[in-house]
From Swiss-Prot:
Major subcellular site: cytoplasm
Annotated positions for site Important for substrate specificity: S191
Active site: C142 (acyl-thioester intermediate), H234 (proton acceptor), E236
UniProt similarity note: Belongs to the MetA family.
Name of the molecule in the record: Homoserine O-succinyltransferase
Stored InterPro entries: Class_I_gatase-like, MetA_family
Length: 325
C-alpha cells in the first residue's frame, strides 16, 4: 500500500506486500478517500496522522490509498492551523471532481447549544447531502454523526448530565460487513457531551451495529444509497488521546475557563494513576491556580487497554468494502 496526500506527496510507502506468488494474486486497487477534518486546531494535525496511520495499517498490500484532506471554510482557524490547511489540504470546492470512493467526516468542538446554530452547519449539511449519492460509504464521527442524523431525519441529540469519557466494552448487536469477524467486545473510546436516542434511531430505519451496556449505542448505519456509518465513539483515537483531552480540561478548570472539575475518563487510567489524580484534584480545588497545570503528574493507563484494536478491525472491513467495487 502507498498512502498519499493530494499531489502525490507521500506520507509513507511501507513494504506491506507478502512475499512470493501472493504479491501477484490480485491486481492493484487504488481507492480515493476524503477526510473532512473538523477537529479544533489543537487536534487538527494529530487527527490527520491518526487517520493516515490507521488507513495504512488497515489496508491490505494490494490496495493503494490516495487520501485527500479537507477543512470546512466556516470553521475558524488560527494562523498556524490555517497555514497547515493551506499547505497540505485540498480545497473543499474540489470535492465534487475527485471521484471519492469513501469519506470520513470528523466531529468538531461544540460551541452553540444547538447544532443548527453552529457557524459550520450549512457547510456540514451540504456535505451530508453530497455524500448520499457521491460515495460508496461515509463514516460520520461523534458530533458529525449527530449532525448527520439531525439533518437527515430531524433526530435531535440529547445533552448528557455529565461528559461521557472513557473506554467502554461495545458488543456486536447484528451481523454486518463492517463488524465481520468481530466476536469479542470492542474497547472503544468515547468522549462526548451528547447522545442520540437509540429507540428513535431504530424507528427511523437505522441499523444498530454495536452498543455498550454503560453508554448505549456505539455504531449505527443506514443505506442512503451510500452506506452511512455513524460512530458515537472515537475508535480512531490513539492510546493517549483521552489523556490529552483530560489534561486540557484540567488546565481549563485551573484557568477559570470552566466551573466544574472534570471527571477522569472511565476504565482508562491504571489504579495507581487514578489515586494520583484524586490527590491532585484535592490540591486543584483548594488552590485554583493555572501554574498548577505544570505540576500534573505522569500517568499510566490500565495494563489491559487494547488501544487501536477496534479501529483496525473496523477500518479493515471498511476498506475491504470499498475495494470490493
Amino acid at each position: 500500500m502507498t498512502l498519499l496526500f493530494d499531489g502525490d506527496r507521500r506520507i509513507k510507502s511501507p513494504a506491506l506486500a507478502p512475499a512470493g506468488g501472493d504479491r501477484r494474486a490480485r491486481d492493484p486497487i487504488e481507492l480515493t478517500i476524503g477526510l473532512v477534518n473538523n477537529m479544533p486546531d489543537s487536534a487538527l494535525k494529530a487527527t490527520d496522522v491518526q487517520i493516515a496511520r490507521l488507513l495504512q495499517q488497515a489496508a491490505p498490500w494490494h490496495v493503494r490509498i490516495r487520501l485527500h484532506c479537507f477543512s470546512l471554510p466556516s470553521i475558524a482557524r488560527s494562523p498556524m492551523a490555517s497555514s497547515h490547511v493551506a499547505q497540505t489540504y485540498t480545497d473543499i470546492d474540489r470535492l465534487d471532481g475527485l471521484d471519492i470512493d469513501g469519506l470520513i467526516v470528523t466531529g468538531a468542538e461544540p460551541v452553540a447549544a444547538r447544532l443548527r446554530d453552529e457557524s459550520y452547519w450549512p457547510d456540514l449539511a451540504a456535505i451530508v447531502d453530497w455524500a448520499r449519492t457521491n460515495t460508496k460509504t461515509t463514516i460520520w464521527s461523534c458530533l458529525a454523526a449527530h449532525a448527520a442524523v439531525l439533518h437527515l431525519d430531524d433526530i435531535e441529540r440529547q445533552r448528557l448530565a455529565s461528559k461521557c469519557s472513557g473506554v467502554f466494552d461495545c458488543v456486536k448487536v447484528r451481523d454486518d460487513w463492517l463488524t465481520h469477524g468481530i466476536d469479542a467486545p470492542l474497547q472503544v473510546p468515547h468522549s462526548r457531551l451528547n447522545a442520540v436516542n437509540e429507540p428513535l434511531l431504530a424507528e427511523r430505519g437505522y441499523d444498530i451495529l454495536t452498543r455498550s451496556a454503560e453508554v448505549g449505542v456505539d455504531i449505527f448505519a443506514r443505506t442512503m444509497p451510500s452506506r452511512f456509518v455513524f460512530f458515537q465513539g472515537h475508535p480512531e483515537y490513539d492510546a493517549l488521546s483521552l489523556q490529552r483531552e483530560y489534561m486540557r480540561d484540567i488546565a481549563r478548570y485551573l484557568a477559570g475557563q470552566r466551573e466544574d472539575y472534570p471527571r477522569p475518563p472511565r476504565s482508562y487510567f491504571s489504579a495507581e494513576s487514578e489515586a494520583v489524580l484524586n490527590t491532585f484534584e484535592i490540591r486543584a480545588r483548594a488552590r485554583r491556580d493555572p501554574t498548577l497545570a505544570a505540576e500534573l503528574p505522569g500517568l499510566t493507563l490500565r495494563p489491559d487497554l487494547a488501544a487501536g484494536h477496534a479501529a483496525k478491525l473496523l477500518f479493515r472491513n471498511w476498506i475491504g468494502y470499498l475495494a470490493d467495487g
